[in-house]
């Protein structure tokens, strides 16, 4: 008997909240880092280890929950992830030492990764082609809003209840998503589920990683994520220290740039297909990053920098939507693993690029990271699109020949 399907509205809200785990788990407690050093009587570097641990957990956890959800289904895997998230968050609140807190942040990141990776897998289960791209664009827009809202909400909650108040809110969010997971109807039928033997898991990973087109799409996604994290890591110093903006002015500009990503991710689905959106977005990224690189080296004024950064991040949002949709469409039969690798490589590139942004002259370093990331992502996009276009040309030629043969047959019959 076919199970009852969730409404589209519920699916959008639920998947959007799951995908927002990344920014909420990572960014929400940033305003309280200085006060936590006093609470745990430790150094700032030890407190920042909690942020590093959560990022590692968010990357590694996707490689765990992706294959697990392919075997046991999305709903049961979500329930396990949400329960683990609640337990680890409660543990963070009750932590007495910084080492306990860091260890539990790692577990919290792994659990949060379950929500992120399974949300994309559910979208791939339920939608395909342009509909999948539209759903991922909506999820990306919600994720972009969460990126803006997380530090602002964290600052507000820290005024009320300190860092404990922030983690109490995360606990409340986990309860809501656990309830949503109970209400969610399984999207992966038992016939579609994969064997969980280690040999089969490794075989499926090998199958996915041998798909060159998929690899190009996720590499393009990861390199674009590197451009985004280069901006996140450098923008506070460029805007506040170099251009002299106040924290409030910086927050407004940071929020405006995030909104640019939200808008462009929805614009991407207006293209005829996602390949056109990826081609346009990656080309525009390369052009804008080249101009921004030159502007930062020459010492431009603030409004030139902000205008170029705004436009660059808009193209980042567009390529995120296109490359993630194309990657997931390439490996529909291994959606969990495909989603896991996509998310893991994104956080991996983000983790590599973030510390590099602080080396040397930050204006020059940031400009170089923007240019290098955009150039490499453009090359990956071009390679993937060229493979598709060559296949399409061959297919078109075959259909053309068949049509000519059919027409010749009709003429002979007459």
Q: Model regions: which residues?
A:
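Helix-breaking motifs and short loop linkers at transmembrane-helix boundaries and internal kinks
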Residues: 41, 73, 94-100, 111, ...
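Paired small-residue
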Residues: 84, 88-91, 99-107, 303-311
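Helix-loop-helix hairpin linking two adjacent transmembrane segments in secondary transporters
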Residues: 100, 129, 137-182
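C-terminal transmembrane helical hairpin of 12-TM major facilitator-type secondary transporters
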Residues: 278-322
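A late C-terminal transmembrane helix in Major Facilitator Superfamily
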Residues: 326-362, 369-370
């Amino acid at each position: 008997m076919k199970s009852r399907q969730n409404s589209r509205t519920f699916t959008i809200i639920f998947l959007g909240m799951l995908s927002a785990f990344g920014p909420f788990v990572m960014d929400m407690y940033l305003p309280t880092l200085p006060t936590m050093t006093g609470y745990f009587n430790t150094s700032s570097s030890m407190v920042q280890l909690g942020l590093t641990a959560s990022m590692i957990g968010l990357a590694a956890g996707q490689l765990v929950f992706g294959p697990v959800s392919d075997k046991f289904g999305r709903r049961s895997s979500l329930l396990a992830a949400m329960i683990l998230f609640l337990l680890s968050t409660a543990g963070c609140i009750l932590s007495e030492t910084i080492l306990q807190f860091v260890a539990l942040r790692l577990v919290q990141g792994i659990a949060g990764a379950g929500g992120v990776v399974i949300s994309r897998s559910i979208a791939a289960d339920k939608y395909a082609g342009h509909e999948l791209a539209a759903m991922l664009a909506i999820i990306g827009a919600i994720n972009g809003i969460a990126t803006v809202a997380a530090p602002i909400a964290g600052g507000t909650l820290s005024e009320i209840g300190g860092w404990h108040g922030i983690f109490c809110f995360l606990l409340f969010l986990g309860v809501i998503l656990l309830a949503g997971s109970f209400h969610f109807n399984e999207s992966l039928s038992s016939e579609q589920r994969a064997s969980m033997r280690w040999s089969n898991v490794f075989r499926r990973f090998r199958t996915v990683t041998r798909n060159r087109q998929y690899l190009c799409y996720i590499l393009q996604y990861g390199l674009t994520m590197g451009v985004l994290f280069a901006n996140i890591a450098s923008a506070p110093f460029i805007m506040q220290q170099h251009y002299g903006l106040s924290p409030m002015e910086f927050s407004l500009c940071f929020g405006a740039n995030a909104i640019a990503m939200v808008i462009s991710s929805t614009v991407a689905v207006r293209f005829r297909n996602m390949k056109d959106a990826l081609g346009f977005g990656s080309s525009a990224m390369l052009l804008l990053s080249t101009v921004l690189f030159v502007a930062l080296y020459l010492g431009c004024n603030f409004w030139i920098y902000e205008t170029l950064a705004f436009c660059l991040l808009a193209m980042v949002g567009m390529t995120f939507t296109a490359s993630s949709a194309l990657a997931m469409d390439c490996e529909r039969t291994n959606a969990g693993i495909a989603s896991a690798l996509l998310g893991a490589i994104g956080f991996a590139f983000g983790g590599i690029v973030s510390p590099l942004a602080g080396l040397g002259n930050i204006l020059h370093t940031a400009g170089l990271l923007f240019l290098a990331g955009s150039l490499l992502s453009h090359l990956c996009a071009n390679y993937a699109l060229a493979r598709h276009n060559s296949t399409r040309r061959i297919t078109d030629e075959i259909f053309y020949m068949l049509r000519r043969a059919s027409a010749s047959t009709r003429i002979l019959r007459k």
